[in-house]
Amino acid sequence: MNPIDLRSDTVTPPTERMRKAMAEAEVGDDVYGEDPTVRRLEDLAADRTGKAAALLVASGTMANLVCQLVHCGRGDEMILGDQSHIFHYEQGGSAAVGGIHPRTVPNRPDGTIDPVVIEAAVRADDVHFPRSRLLVLENTHNRCNGSPLGATYMNRVAETAGRCRLKIHVDGARLFNAAVALGCPAADLVARADSVSFCLSKGLSAPVGSMVCGSREFVTEARRARKVLGGGMRQAGIIAAAGIVALTEMVDRLAEDHVNARRLAEGLDGIEGLSADPAAVHTNIVFFEIADRRTTAAALAAALAAAGVLVLALDPYRLRAVTHYPLTGADIERTLAVVRSCLGN
């Protein structure tokens, strides 16, 4: 029996339609701008995000770094949440590669940042300080329960950013999870953003790739930044073909992942010794804790892996599970049975 892999939605396999599209993709040299399949994907991504242009890049980390490099010069400062993926999991690339200073401010439990706190973090025009140039938001917010940030909040933050002369970048790795959860077009969530990135290779199930979207002028500069990072690809239409299928066929089904995540959270919360918060689960990310401290997260994760269920141990007593294609409701019930068995319930 195949293991149930809940470590991340990055483990999604490409669909048969994706494999067929990749095998049949029309290609050219994308560095010369001659790959027609890449162009179609970029046009589609721009349309779905309501932006004028888009750019295919290799990964979400590259997408975020490209956007930071375009918005900020060396010695400039970006403001971002203290729980953001960029701050925790992208190797400090903004500083290491771009010379960009990160200034963290607290994320609230729902992934938002108080606009008052944002405004207070903006530097005065003084030679002692870096220049505040960029505000980064994350939607959905990975470390904050996969919470979606709604359009009302995004628009309110945009007003603050405008007053403070900050550009806005949205790390939208799971932007379409947010759109599905909130029942609105993805474009509505990033209408006021200067740039947005999203992943094709998470819940949308493409094997590789992320998109950077913004104005035509922004994407022209992003293309230069991609090149210096080694991200210029040649016959990239083979990758882009899967991305087209992802955007046209895999968005609506994200709702299934959200249902499975809620069921998983409810089941975990009902197991003696564990705690989860089903009410906090709005998309496909579930955090749960060993409430009675009978074992550690690492030990439980190892026991589950031996029984065919893979999850991530994050902290001494805290774990994460992420639902995704092609997992089913039956897989969730099997997972819960394995957890009960491993805990002796």
What do these predicted regions represent?
Residues 1-279, 283-307, 312-327, 335-344:
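Conserved PLP-enzyme active-site core in the AAT-like
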